[in-house]
Amino acid sequence: MLSKVKVPLHDLMSSVLALEESALDTDQVENLIKFCPTKEEMELLKGYNGEKEKLGRCEQFLMELMKVPRVESKLRVFSFRIQFNSQVSDLRNSLSVVNSASEEIRNSVKLKRIMQTILSLGNALNQGTAKGSAIGFRLDSLLKLTETRARDKKMTLMHYLCKVLDDQLPDVLDFSKDVANLEPAAKMQLKFLAEEMQAINKGLEKVVQELSTSENDGPISETFCKKLKKFLGSAEADVRSLASLYSSVGRNVDQLILYFGEDPARCPFEQVVSTLLNFTRMFNKAHEENRKQLELEMKKTAESEKKKCESERILPTAIRTGNVK
């Protein structure tokens, strides 16, 4: 690992203490943390009074590490600093996708009209039964529309829904354009986003703690403290903004689940968007199949009409020919 480090050993910790991000990447810093000397190793090296150049490269490196108070803690802070911007950016992007998807779904008038049509169809099919006057339906019922078939077994309720909408509300057929963030949101796991938010908060706490302790280290940590204070000034503001977005996402997710009449404690966000994404795909597929079936029927009708016209032209000719004879 040491052979991959571009910075000379005697400058390595100076780069770390100066928080020079270009000196090392995250993997290299993590490997350095593994190299941190144990108490036993430190005691052995402290007792060495010979020439440092006669030691192996690893031993020389351990002696460099020993010069820095709480070197492991500082390396972890350095690692956090290197990853901070990308971590915050990635989490912000993921949260924004969840937020946008939640708002798009709730604000889609087209999707709402489709849901109303599904309810009307369900009540019509169940007319005369206890289910014939329902005021709503469970979200997972959307996925059962492909299971209910007509007597000829060719058309499903999903096909019929698309046909009704095509006849009565054709403008809603492209509702999927209203929910552009549905598919990327379906790839998100809120549990992992929560863990990432927690990791960033804990990492920042460690930075604050190390800064407070390092201020008593003396000259060796002066640059480290100066750079860390500057980093904290912007990092704390970034994390506050991120935490605010995270809270907003939590509220929007709950509102989305309640919008469909479900319980946030029992129906997680992942289930909602997964169900809606599958419904969208099945809906689009059924609509496309309807379109192809209609084209096929129109083609057959046209061919039938063509044959009829041709036969009508042939028949008089045959009669006239017979009269001549």
Cite the ranges covered by each PLM segment:
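Folded alpha-helical bundle/alpha-solenoid domain cores of large eukaryotic adaptor/scaffold proteins
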Residues: 1-293, 300
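Long, low-complexity intrinsically disordered regulatory regions
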Residues: 309-325
